[in-house]
Swiss-Prot record:
Protein's name in the database: Phosphoglucosamine mutase
Keywords assigned: Isomerase, Magnesium, Metal-binding, Phosphoprotein
Species this protein is from: Buchnera aphidicola subsp. Baizongia pistaciae (strain Bp)
Active site: S100
Pfam families, per database record: PGM_PMM_I, PGM_PMM_II, PGM_PMM_III
Cofactor: record remark: Binds 1 Mg(2+) ion per subunit.
GO MF terms, alphabetically ordered: magnesium ion binding; phosphoglucosamine mutase activity; phosphomannomutase activity
Binding site for Mg(2+): S100, D239, D241, D243
SUPFAM superfamilies tied to this protein: Phosphoglucomutase, C-terminal domain, Phosphoglucomutase, first 3 domains
Amino acid sequence: MIKYFGTDGIRGVVGKTPITADFFFKLGAVIGKILYFYDVKKIIIGRDTRLSSYMLEEALQFGLSLVGVSVISVGVLPTPAISYFTKLFNLEVGVVISASHNQFRDNGIKFFVKNGVKLSAKFERRIEKQLNKTIILKQFVDLGHISYKRALQQKYINFCISTLPNNFRLNNFKIVLDCANGSTYELAPIIFRELGANVVLMSAAPNGLNINDKCGTTDLQEIQRLVLSEKADLGISFDGDGDRVIMIDHFGNSVNGDQILYILAKNYKKNKKLRGGVVGTKMSNGGLSLALSKIGIPFITVNIGDRYIFKKLKEKQWRLGAESSGHVILLDYAPVGDGIITSLQILKIIFDENSTLKSLCSDIHMLPQIIINIKNNIDISFLKNFKIQSVLSKYKDFLGKYSRIMLRLSGTEKCIRIMIEGCCSKKINIFSKMLINVINSVKKSRFSIITMF
């Protein structure tokens, strides 16, 4: 059976299966038939600013309407807004067409079910099973209809602001806002300006091709430069669909999801709002675990993907979880990552404590970490080669205390990720070069290297 779903929905290159109009039509028909069986006849669809998103939405709508399911099309909105409206309108399903932090060549789709939570892996497998069959479409007497609601922005703006105290203001606080030329490009500036902030706006002019292009949470150079040149108090960078956020302190240092989770957890504990502990993933920096341990906050890691964080939070009845990449779940407000709400909560802590983002991060010391991406490769089996395994087996001896290595297939891109972490950045650099050389000797590969800390 062909597997279509990754860690966050379906994703791929536009024009190649599964990111084609034909596939999205079939996907719409498959989902529609399943929903119709359960007497679900209406869903909500939003999208990001990619050129291909409109075409894919039209194809999906056609498949859905053909089997009797009606669609509320809300246009360009952040992913967490679709989660919010799925719950607000008491709908069974919400859909977002987006490839999140990927560039315009990619696109994808993700789903929410009742109460705005991500679709379960079990339901994804059910959809995949049907997609692997030949679809027979009978003539439906009642076709679904499509309605367009483009005036929902203010409702979501009001919701985001409602997560703050009534008298909260950001007067004269200078913020560089990077909207990644994506789904937050209209909403985010309105929200921060309405709160009184002095907003320096970047990457808020989408043209369908520039989403996440030298901007957004995976490319921070420009926002870091602007924070310094504008003498801003901090920077806030969203990804293309607004469910991730990375922040920049006034010295130009990035503050990722692990550090944001630490700031929130420490504040929650101080204010007696913390229920139990917090949840991260297997990619969470070891420095987070050490810092949380020092202040007595339990920490559990789960598989990559914010839905696994949500599942563990519900199981433990905890409230906070995050991925290093900037997906931060605050269950008091939303069941998914919401970049705007997360950044607002951090700003509230800064003002409550009369502090700075830099100071709030001062007692979490991130371990040096490098991520090696082996590009255009989804066959992880070659890493079992004895030469590669010989190098990997020596990492503990070479890197020392607190060191670890993780190898995994990316759930959002066509690549293999290798994370190397330890106490000494020099040793990690040396070891990563050794590993790249031996991998290349076994199989010629293209690499990208990200130095995290």
